UniProtKB/Swiss-Prot annotation:
One Gene Ontology term from the biological process aspect of the record: defense response to Gram-negative bacterium
Superkingdom in the source lineage: Eukaryota
Recorded family membership: Belongs to the ascaphin family.
Species this chain originates from: Ascaphus truei
Tissue: Expressed by the skin glands.
Gene Ontology CC entries for this record: extracellular region
Coiled-coil boundaries: none
Keywords, ordered alphabetically: Amidation, Amphibian defense peptide, Antibiotic, Antimicrobial, Secreted
Function recorded in the entry: Antimicrobial peptide that shows higher potency against Gram-negative bacteria than against Gram-positive bacteria. Has a very week hemolytic activity.
Protein name: Ascaphin-1
Length: 23
């Protein structure tokens, strides 16, 4: 559902931000 999509997007966003901070 829409909530799952939102959760997936949030996870991907956090992963991306964490990656940028790590670099």
């Amino acid at each position: 559902g829409f909530r799952d999509v939102l959760k997936g997007a949030a996870k991907a966003f956090v992963k991306t931000v964490a990656g940028h901070i790590a670099n």
